[in-house]
Structures are given as structure tokens and as C-alpha cells.
Amino acid sequence: MSVPDNAFQHRYGPWAVIAGASHGVGAAFARSLAERGLNCVLVARRGDTLAQLKSELEQQYAIDVLVVTQDLSHPDACERLLAAVGERPVGLFIYNAGGDPYITRFLDTSAEDWGALLRLNCLTVMQCSHAFGAAMLERGQGGLLLVGSQAALGGIRKLAMYTATKGFALNLGESLWAEWKDRGVDVLNLLIGTVDTPTMRNAMVKLNIADALTMTLPKAEDLALLALEELGNGPTLIHPEDTLVQVANARG
């Protein structure tokens, strides 16, 4: 059931941090949260895109928006983000970063590059969950939403490190849900199989999935809306219309 705007603001406001907010599902989260009256911290590498989204949200919803231009794969990404957020009371942290820019066989990408993906999908997730979660627990309310992938459920050829790191985030989220659910802090994993974004369709093309550019996929807005509605019903959510494309040959 949907949480009324005033109740949602009280439980998860006044500030929400959306890591990976420049486009797709992250931008959809930002718009939906702004509509509910939450101030937003927008985090991504693309400062120009974030600036455009900031202007849109401020003008349309009369909220405050902070832009943080940050590569979340850097070793000090969480430290820099926390410094930028400062004393703003964050009641909701959404981690939506973490796509695989390589989509190659394991040995065809350097260990250094895999290390960056490991930091993006594991280290920064852990550090931010630790920092923001501690503050929420101290206040006795808040929410943590980890946007993951159905790829976390099993290994896939050309996605070895991606599936492994997404498995880490899935288990972290479910464990934190068990630890925090009786202490006022909601935790939800949103596992996305497919979504109608250019990034997803390009990845499907690289994986040689038939009709990757034309098949009907769930909309980013629908995924974000459902996740916010179900935030209090963790630990893990899959949109009912989001069925991961079968790539059995990729598992061989």
C-alpha cells in the first residue's frame, strides 16, 4: 500500500540521497521523491546532467536539491559524499549506481578495472550503508534502498564480476533488513532484470539477446514507484512484469 505523502516525508525525509541519479531508474527515483516533498541529494559522475535534473526538480516541486559530482568507484567516494552532505538529515539512502561497463569474459578485462567495479558495487555500498544507516538508527527511522540486479541470483558468462558483486549487495541488504527491521529502519533490495533504458538495451545487445532494441521492457518510472511503495515490505522486491530475459546459452 502507498504511504501518504505526509507520512512518507516524516518517515524518510527530509533529505534523500540518490547515488546514481543522472538518468534511468535513478532519475525516476529523484522525480518521485521530489513529488512526495523530499529534498534530494543527486549523486553521479555527470554534473551537467545532474544540474539539469536539479533545475527541473526545484522548479516543478519547490524542493531543495544538492548536486554531488562524484565517481562512486573511487576509494574515497563515500568520504567525499559524506562531506558534501554535511549536517543534512538524510532519511533515505538509495544506491542505484553499479552497472557493468565491460561485459567481457573475466580475463579480457584487467584486474585493475575489475577492482574499480568491486569498489563501485561493494566497498562504496558498504561504506555508505554503514554511515547513513548508523544515523538513521540513531533517529529510529529511515530507509535504505539498494538497487540491484537479478544477475545476483546466479553466474552469467561475460558478467562474472558483475554477478558476484551484485550478489554481495543482495546479501548485505537482506542481512541489514534482518538487523534493522525492528529498529525503525526499512531496507529493501530492488532486483532489476530488465528496464527500458538505453544503458540496459545496449547491455542486452552486447549479450547477443534477440530483439534487444525492440522488446517491451518495464519503465524506469514504474520500477521506482513500486519500490518506494514497497519500501517497508523488505527484504527483496522484483517487479511482477520484470522477468529477466532468458540467456541460458550465456550460462554455459
Please provide the spans of the model-predicted regions.
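Conserved glycine-rich cofactor-binding loop
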Residues: W15, S22-G24
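Conserved glycine-rich Rossmann-like NAD(P)H-binding loop of the short-chain dehydrogenase/reductase
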Residues: R36-Q52
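Substrate-binding pocket helix/loop in short-chain dehydrogenase/reductase
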Residues: T104-F106, D113-G115
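Active-site helix of classical SDR
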Residues: S129, T165
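Residue(s) in the substrate-gating loop at a strand-loop-helix junction
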Residues: S149
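Active-site-adjacent segment of SDR/Rossmann-fold oxidoreductases
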Residues: G154, S175-D186
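C-terminal helical subdomain
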Residues: N189, V205-A248
